[in-house]
C-alpha cells in the first residue's frame, strides 16, 4: 500500500486489507481508529465484502474498500 499524494489517493491492495489499521480524518461518534476485520472475495478474487471495526466502540460497518483510497477521508495506520 503506497500513498500517491499527487492524485489524492492511496494505493490499496485488496489482499492486504485484512487486519490493516486506518484513521478517519473527520472523527464522528468518537470513532477515529479502525481495523479491517472481514474481507471476502469471489471466485475472481474481487472483494465482495469488507467490514471495518471502530477500535474504541467496537462498532462494525460494511464499507466499500475503495473508499479507503481517498486521502481526504482516510489515513493508513493509526495517527
Please state what every model-predicted region is.
Residues 24-35:
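Short coil-to-beta-strand transition motifs
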Residues 34, 46-51:
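Short aromatic-glycine-enriched beta-strand elements
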Residues 39, 53-55:
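Generic beta-structure capping elements
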Residues 56-79:
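Intrinsically disordered, low-complexity, charged/polar segments
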Residues 1-18:
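Mixed-charge, Lys/Arg-rich low-complexity intrinsically disordered regions
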Residues 39-46:
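Short, conserved beta-turn/loop elements at beta-strand boundaries and strand-helix junctions
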Residues 19, 25, 48, 55-59, ...:
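Basic nucleic-acid-binding interfaces
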Amino acid at each position: 500500500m503506497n500513498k500517491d499524494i499527487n492524485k489524492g489517493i492511496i494505493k490499496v491492495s485488496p489482499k492486504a486489507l485484512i487486519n490493516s489499521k486506518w484513521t478517519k480524518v473527520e472523527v464522528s461518534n468518537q470513532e477515529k481508529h479502525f481495523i479491517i476485520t472481514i474481507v471476502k472475495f469471489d471466485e475472481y478474487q474481487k472483494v465482495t465484502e469488507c467490514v471495518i471495526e471502530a477500535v474504541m466502540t467496537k462498532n462494525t460497518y460494511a464499507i466499500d474498500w475503495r473508499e479507503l483510497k481517498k486521502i481526504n477521508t482516510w489515513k493508513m495506520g493509526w495517527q
